[in-house]
């Protein structure tokens, strides 16, 4: 009887050990999977400042799609997250000009390669600027965007450091990814456009 009791105790101990090992494996796999997803696919980012107002607000959190760096391509109008050159600061801006294009603003109208380009995401800001009797963007250019670089601007053109005035043209390897979704605050979840 004692021998049988010892065998049962050993079996129970082995089951517990196996259970702990299985849980340990599951936790390690989950952590590795989360790290891989965050590094290569999606990552949350915090919006700091008002340069993208009214599209994005200070304190909102975005999910950034990093797959555009591996598959797909950046498109004009995409909201992009940019690594700072010398610090851990990230910038959130709208992609305006792509490599090889010529960018110009005249009378608050965007021209790419001499052709007018609509910017529907600016309609609210344009109305506010008109009420104040000021130009939303100000004239500039033409600026030729070289190979491997991008021209970006904030939607809050009167209050944005961007390719016009401080950030300069953005190297492709500084673009982390594109924003597609605001997930916080929860009551303001939405797609970004």
UniProtKB/Swiss-Prot annotation:
Topology with respect to the bilayer: Single-pass type II membrane protein
Catalytic activity reported: Cleavage of hydrophobic, N-terminal signal or leader sequences from secreted and periplasmic proteins
Gene Ontology molecular function, alphabetical: serine-type endopeptidase activity
EC number per UniProt: 3.4.21.89
Induction conditions: Expressed at the postexponential growth phase; regulated by the DegS-DegU system.
Compartment(s) where it occurs, according to its Swiss-Prot or TrEMBL record: Cell membrane
Alphabetical list of PROSITE patterns matching this protein: SPASE_I_1, SPASE_I_2, SPASE_I_3
NCBIfam families with a match to the protein in the record: sigpep_I_bact (TIGR02227)
Family membership: Belongs to the peptidase S26 family.
Protein's UniProt name: Signal peptidase I T
Taxonomic source organism: Bacillus subtilis (strain 168)
Gene that encodes it: sipT
């Amino acid at each position: 009887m004692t021998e049988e009791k010892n065998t049962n105790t050993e079996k129970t101990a082995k089951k517990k050990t196996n259970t702990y090992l299985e849980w340990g494996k599951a936790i390690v796999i989950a952590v590795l999977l989360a790290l891989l997803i965050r590094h290569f696919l999606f990552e949350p980012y915090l919006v700091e400042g008002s340069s993208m107002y009214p599209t994005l607000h200070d304190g909102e959190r975005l999910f950034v799609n990093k797959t555009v760096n591996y598959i797909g391509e950046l498109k004009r109008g995409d909201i992009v997250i940019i690594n700072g050159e010398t610090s851990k600061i990230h910038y959130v801006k709208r992609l305006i000009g792509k490599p090889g294009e010529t960018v110009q603003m005249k009378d608050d109208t965007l021209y790419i390669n001499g052709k007018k380009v609509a910017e529907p995401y600016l309609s609210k800001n344009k109305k506010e600027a008109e009420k104040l009797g000021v130009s939303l963007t100000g004239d500039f250019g033409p600026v030729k965007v070289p190979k491997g670089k991008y021209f970006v601007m904030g939607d809050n053109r009167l209050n944005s450091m961007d390719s016009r005035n401080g950030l300069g043209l953005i190297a492709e390897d500084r673009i982390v990814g594109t924003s597609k979704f605001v997930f916080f605050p929860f009551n303001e979840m939405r797609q970004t456009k």
